[in-house]
Amino acid sequence: MMPSRTNLATGIPSSKVKYSRLSSTDDGYIDLQFKKSPPKIPYKAIALATVLFLIGAFLIIIGSLLLAGYISKGGADRAVPVLIIGILVFLPGFYHLRIAYYASKGYRGYSYDDIPDFDD
């Protein structure tokens, strides 16, 4: 049992906190302060990046098929806006998925901290 701290004047323990002496060979450092905590994986941000990637890829494919004339004969007036929106949605999704992949594989220079997270 660990000794509790006592009030010297009355001899009564002043709290329920247990104290113990530090070893005399201790240099003031503990191993826990040097251990790296496991990275916090931003699952919501990765899910959003996946959705953006898939929607963007779908819009790029549809825009390409519209431009080629396989879906309808509308021509470039319908295909170009779909392609532009597809590219604008695809690029952030691809970028963040690439960071998440490299961070999960442990590549140097990539971490989950580079992915913006929803702080909730």
Curated annotation (Swiss-Prot):
Compartments where located: Membrane; Golgi apparatus, trans-Golgi network; Cytoplasmic vesicle, Secretory vesicle, Synaptic vesicle; Early endosome
Keywords, alphabetical: Cytoplasmic vesicle, Endosome, Golgi apparatus, Membrane, Phosphoprotein, Synapse, Transmembrane, Transmembrane helix
Residue stretches spanning the membrane: 51-71, 79-99
Chief place of localization: membrane
Record membrane topology: Multi-pass membrane protein
PTM-bearing positions, type Phosphoserine: S15, S23, S24
Family to which the UniProt record says this protein belongs: Belongs to the TMEM134/TMEM230 family.
Protein name: Transmembrane protein 230
Gene: TMEM230
